Amino acid sequence: MDSNSPVNQITNDPLAAIRIPEFKNLMLGRFTFIMALRMMSTLVAWWVYELTNDPFAIGLVGLSEVIPAISTALYAGHIIDLSEKRKLLLRGVFFYTCAAAILLFFSTSYIGSHFSKLAITIGIYAVIFCSGIVRSFTGPTFSAILASTVPRPYLQNATTWNQGSWLSASVTGHAMGGFLIATIGITNTLITVCSLLVIAFFVLMRLKPKPSLPQSGEKKTWESVTEGLRFVFRTKELLAAFSLDMFAVLFGGAVAMVPVYAKDILKAGPMGFGWLNAAVDIGAIFIVVLLAFFPMKKAQGKKLFLAVAGFGICIILFALSEWFVLSFAALLIAGMLDGVSVVVRGTVMQLKTPDHMRGRVSSVGSMFINSSNELGQFESGMAARLMGVVPSVVFGGCMTLIVVIITWIKAPTLRKFEY
């Protein structure tokens, strides 16, 4: 690739993107929003396991969210590219606030005294299902807005800080979720979640309007909807990066079983659950901040493969551990390696995607990557029921290593990729 091309005109200032006021507003709003959602997901996993005492029930939480998220992802990308993105994002945050408010109502003593545990659990699944539809719009909208807040030479730096903000929020949300469940209970934790979502809404209102960009010619709706998918399949580096991450997360979804490990194997309680749930993200944020100041200069493709392989090994170690400190350390290192994967994949997507297709390509990315988290949660729950909790997590780690080997052989363009 030509060293003078726009892709390679990358700033060496680690704080370049942070100096842009609108980018700071986007990061602050996204931080608050993601922190609230991670608190809610931590709470829901613990709450459902407390109601059912069944690992498979945790898996069904993921399935409840992923079915609508995948089903609507392509159409959501089409709508995002045709819409004013700031308004669309604010609507998504509003609907998430409504979902959290409904969960808050379900947690009250009135509902607990008038409905069975099964009915409450089904109600939780229904709310998560609806939030999956909203998620198919909000996640890609954030990604599409990102590129319009910074100049192109700042994209790698902005992507790194964006992932750092996301991971910091995830760490804080997971840890605070466990801490608040233990100290103030489920209902008051949900009040906190609702408050954070309201704050995120008002912060994101400070963004400038983001109108749709001109599209290349008139297209039928279905043709436009599938254009992002066709673009990803034509762009080999992007397809390989998405596929590698998707299958690694799908089979390496050990975090889905953290409630079981915390409660039944490690005897760590809600507080330990919160820290174990946050361990992967703590590791990831450390490496992402490190990469912001010391970015990878070459061989990013090979480093991506090594990182995902190391992630699989850490998952196996976590599965076999019966000591809290070792379990936390295994997840922490897994998070560091996952952080490398996140930065490389995110940068590849931002650099390879045309501006007028960012919504659709981001939606395809959400189908590949984000939805694999919930599918991995379901796979982990199903495997735990069939094989037992520990063997199922070992199996997931081994499958991650197999995926790395297959992708290494089948995707030489990603293996050789540099930016």
PLM region spans:
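Hydrophobic alpha-helical transmembrane segments
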Residues: 99, 118-128, 132, 157-214, ...
